[in-house]
C-alpha cells in the first residue's frame, strides 16, 4: 500500500469517526470466509458500517478527531488496537452493534467476533465482557421518554390527590349538612 492509498484510508476513517456517535472495534480473525461475508451482510442489513483497517491507520485517523479525550485515545492505543481490528460504526442506538455481534455468535455457534472495545458518547468500554451490558443499552429517545414519564408521575399523583381530596371534602360537607338537618 503506497502513501496515497494510506492517506485516503486515513481520511475515510477520520470522516467516519467524526460523523458517528459510537464505534465498536472487533476481532474477527479465525472466522471462515463464508462467516466473514455473512457478518458483513448482517452489518449492512442492520445499517452498521463495518470497516477493516490497520491499527496504525486507525490511530492516525483518531489523531484527527477533535472530541477524542487523550485518556480514551491512550487506552485505545495501548489496550484495544492490538492484532486484527474491524470497526463497526453506528449512529442511532449504541446497542445495535453489540446486539448484532451477539446474534451472529448465537446463530453461528461461535465465540467470534470478539469485542475489543466500544466508544460510546465519550466513554470507552474495553473487553468482550462488556458485550452483554452494551447489548442492553437503551436508546436516547427511550431514556428521555422514561425520564419524562418519571417527571410526570409525581404531578399526576398530586393532581389525583387534589381531585380525590375535593370529592372527599364535598362528601364530608354534605354529610355534615345532612346530619345537622
UniProtKB/Swiss-Prot annotation:
Keyword Zinc: no
Role this protein plays: Forms part of the ribosomal stalk, playing a central role in the interaction of the ribosome with GTP-bound translation factors.
Signal peptide: none
InterPro entries from the UniProt entry: Ribosomal_uL10 (IPR001790), Ribosomal_uL10-like_sf (IPR043141), Ribosomal_uL10_bac (IPR022973), Ribosomal_uL10_bac_type (IPR047865)
UniProt keyword Aminoacyl-tRNA synthetase present: no
GO biological process terms on file: translation
Assembly information from the UniProt record: Part of the ribosomal stalk of the 50S ribosomal subunit. The N-terminus interacts with L11 and the large rRNA to form the base of the stalk. The C-terminus forms an elongated spine to which L12 dimers bind in a sequential fashion forming a multimeric L10(L12)X complex.
UniProt protein name: Large ribosomal subunit protein uL10
GO molecular function: large ribosomal subunit rRNA binding
Cited CDD domains: Ribosomal_L10
Originating organism: Amoebophilus asiaticus (strain 5a2)
Family membership noted in the UniProt record: Belongs to the universal ribosomal protein uL10 family.
Keyword terms of this UniProt record: Ribonucleoprotein, Ribosomal protein, RNA-binding, rRNA-binding
Any one of the GO CC terms: ribonucleoprotein complex
Entry-linked Gene3D superfamilies: 3.30.70.1730
Amino acid at each position: 500500500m503506497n502513501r496515497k492509498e494510506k492517506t485516503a484510508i486515513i481520511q475515510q476513517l477520520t470522516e467516519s469517526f467524526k460523523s458517528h456517535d459510537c464505534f465498536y472495534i472487533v476481532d474477527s480473525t479465525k472466522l471462515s470466509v463464508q462467516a466473514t461475508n455473512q457478518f458483513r451482510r448482517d452489518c449492512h442489513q442492520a445499517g452498521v458500517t463495518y470497516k477493516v483497517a490497520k491499527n496504525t491507520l486507525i490511530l492516525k485517523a483518531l489523531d484527527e478527531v477533535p472530541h477524542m479525550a487523550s485518556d480514551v485515545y491512550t487506552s485505545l492505543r495501548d489496550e484495544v488496537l492490538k492484532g486484527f481490528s474491524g470497526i463497526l460504526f453506528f449512529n442511532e442506538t449504541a446497542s445495535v452493534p453489540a446486539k448484532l455481534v451477539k446474534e451472529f455468535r448465537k446463530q453461528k455457534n461461535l465465540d467470534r467476533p470478539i469485542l475489543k472495545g466500544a466508544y460510546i458518547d465519550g466513554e470507552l468500554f474495553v473487553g468482550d465482557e462488556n458485550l452483554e451490558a452494551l447489548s442492553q443499552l437503551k436508546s436516547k429517545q427511550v431514556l428521555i421518554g422514561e425520564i419524562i414519564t418519571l417527571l410526570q408521575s409525581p404531578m399526576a399523583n398530586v393532581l389525583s390527590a387534589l381531585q380525590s381530596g375535593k370529592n372527599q371534602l364535598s362528601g364530608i360537607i354534605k354529610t355534615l349538612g345532612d346530619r345537622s338537618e
